[in-house]
Amino acid sequence: MTAAGCDSRSVSELQRYSWGETSNPTIVLLHGLTDAGTTWPDAVRRWQGGYHLIAVDLRGHGRSPRFEPDQLTRCYQWWLSDTLDLLSTLDSAPVVVGHSLGGLFALRAAAARPELVRGLVLEDPARPPGAPTPDPEFVAMNEAFLDSFADGGQTQRDRMRAESRWAADEIDQWAASKPLVDRAMIHDGLTLGDGTWEPVFNGLTVPTLLVAPTDSPMAPDPALITNPLVQQVRLDGVGHTVRRDDAQAYHAVVDPFLAAVTAGSPAR
């Protein structure tokens, strides 16, 4: 990412990026499947003035390590371990903002080690199917999707500029991340472990904002969420990539939550 003030380095094996003053409250950004830590440019523009932002390339993505062959059946364990390792390196607990796959592991990290997390923003987090092996249809869909970037991503860039409301640099960084995906992970590693879902939300002990499309098939059933710490917002006219699809609506609900959760945040 070329945003001003970006520092890029490897921490605990993962490729890490940061923006903003380290004295500000920290937000950790966890991306979705096939994206990278560089795919947040619009959010960075909006938040870097008031927060210290940290993003990583999740294992198997971007410039972070590939999975070893004997790790592919346990990718979900590595993603959680990597997330906890990252959070444990920070001087104070951050708000963790996660989309899709990143949202799932932000959720699991907060459930496992709540003392490491100040709050959560979960953008249509991935619902784990609980299956012991990858879904062949889901694998084939992702492989075909990544194959469509064989021309360097120009066709997909043009399509998204014509069809979406995404910011131009969001499209560019999204497309640039696809050739960097670990294809062995896509073919053999797409299992997410335990399929428990709504009970994980009900067990959270940190302030949490869930933002999802009104018709999301992955979001928890609102009627089954009884935890008063979990705020749920469902938005019309957006898909799985809520933030990119309607940045104004996303930030209208997320930014006040961040301000409230980080009010009085200790200096780093």
Model-derived features: positions:
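Conserved serine/cysteine hydrolase catalytic core
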Residues: 184-234
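Catalytic histidine-centered segment of alpha/beta-hydrolase-like enzymes
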Residues: 238-251
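Gly/Ala-rich beta-loop-alpha elbow adjacent to hydrolase catalytic centers
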Residues: 98, 102, 106
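Structural signature of beta-strand start/N-cap positions in the alpha/beta core
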Residues: 26, 52, 93-95, 116-119, ...
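Conserved alpha/beta-hydrolase catalytic His-Asp/Glu region
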Residues: 131-133, 148-202
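Active-site loop/oxyanion-hole signature of alpha/beta-hydrolase fold enzymes
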Residues: 12, 45, 54-97, 252
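Flexible "cap/lid" loop of the alpha/beta hydrolase fold
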Residues: 107, 111, 117-149
